[in-house]
Amino acid sequence: NKHIENYLRSLERIRYNIFNKIKQYNKYVVNEDEKLMYLNDRYEVTKFENYLKIYIPEVIPKYKNVNNYAYKNITLNVMEKTKIYKDLYKDELVFVFIKIVENQKNIDIDNKFVKSIIDGLVLSKVIEDDNIANMFYGVFGTSEKKKKPYTEVYIFKGKMMLDWLQNFINADIK
């Protein structure tokens, strides 16, 4: 229904604008206790010896439901959180592994719009470009009924992909 789609887009725009207002407010607050906590504060990046891990505390939009605001919020958060790792993979072929966790039983993983994650990594210059000479990616979906949906992103040198994937699959199966 077109009305529902327009309504959802409006809600996403409102959410994005509220997040921006909170970000601006927090920028000028002197006392840390007065800062407002919100979803974007829960994005995390951790550097390990051989890879970079990003935690995204929200649902990745589906292709059919994607709009500029959901895409933009995820892209800008990934960019902001990873910019301290600029040039980490300069001139490297990089593999980006995206694990999407939903709390529903049936996930149609090929309908997830992961471009916002890759674009954030390019904008922060963690990876040089998203063309085939610089990166490739894979997406894994799983369901955890008792948890809120989230996404984990692992970035590492492409040559490490096979070993890493084998370890990941073995750990997830146990």
What are these language model-derived features?
Residues 61-65, 104-108, 160-166:
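Short, surface-exposed beta-strand/loop "edge" segments at domain boundaries and coil↔beta transitions
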Residues 100-136, 140-142:
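Short, hydrophobic/π-rich interface segment
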Residues 45-47, 86-91, 145:
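Short glycine/proline-enriched loop/turn "hinge" motifs that connect secondary-structure elements
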Residues 1-35, 42-51:
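N-terminal targeting/trafficking signals and adjacent low-complexity tails
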Residues 65-95, 103-107:
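An N-terminal amphipathic alpha-helical segment
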Residues 50, 91-96, 147-151:
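Residues at beta-strand starts and edge strands
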